[in-house]
Amino acid sequence: MQLYDFYKKNVLIKLKNKFNYKSIMQVPKIEKITLNMGVGKASFDKKLLEHAVNDLTLISGQKPYITKAKKSIANFKIRQGHPIGCKVTLRGKLMWFFFQKLICIAIPRIRDFRGLPVKSFDGFGNYSLGIKEQIIFPEIDYDKIDKIRGLDITITTNAKSDKEGLALLSAFNFPFRK
């Protein structure tokens, strides 16, 4: 909860003054963090999906739910209703704990890291990033994984624009590319 206290004491005041808000309730905040791990061959091999669920459970501290295909796609050999990945939505204390772990531990462990692109905002202040290796998280034991998998992380804010979302994440020293 250290990062939440930092948000309450420093970030709120800094953003309120920067954007000239009348109330601190107008200041953008992080609402949720969504982790998604797609497992393309999950319909053929159930073990792959089990390993992905296990990895995501270790990373997030919460049990993920299995996502299923909405439509059948012949080229990808996917049928409607077949499992294709797993997903976790973090809110509250777990969200702040994961966000701190992401900024302080996981992102610095990325190989050849030169900063995150600013272009990954969606137009409404939400930020998405993709991680190529799950082994950057300290909970994943390198010797026990079956395959290196990537995951998608979406940080959802209640910011009204990308400029506000960028200011919010930059206030937490999020490592954006200069």
Curated annotation (Swiss-Prot):
It holds the Pfam family Ribosomal_L5. Keywords: Ribonucleoprotein, Ribosomal protein, RNA-binding, rRNA-binding, tRNA-binding. InterPro entries: Ribosomal_uL5, Ribosomal_uL5_bac-type, Ribosomal_uL5_C, Ribosomal_uL5_dom_sf, Ribosomal_uL5_N. This is Large ribosomal subunit protein uL5. GO terms for molecular function: rRNA binding; structural constituent of ribosome; tRNA binding. The lineage of its organism: Bacteria, Pseudomonadati, Pseudomonadota, Gammaproteobacteria, Enterobacterales. Part of the 50S ribosomal subunit; part of the 5S rRNA/L5/L18/L25 subcomplex. Contacts the 5S rRNA and the P site tRNA. Forms a bridge to the 30S subunit in the 70S ribosome. One of its GO terms (cellular component) is ribonucleoprotein complex. One of its GO terms (biological process) is translation. Belongs to the universal ribosomal protein uL5 family. SUPFAM superfamilies: RL5-like (SSF55282). NCBIfam families: PRK00010.1. This is one of the proteins that bind and probably mediate the attachment of the 5S RNA into the large ribosomal subunit, where it forms part of the central protuberance. In the 70S ribosome it contacts protein S13 of the 30S subunit (bridge B1b), connecting the 2 subunits; this bridge is implicated in subunit movement. Contacts the P site tRNA; the 5S rRNA and some of its associated proteins might help stabilize positioning of ribosome-bound tRNAs. HAMAP family: Ribosomal_uL5_B.
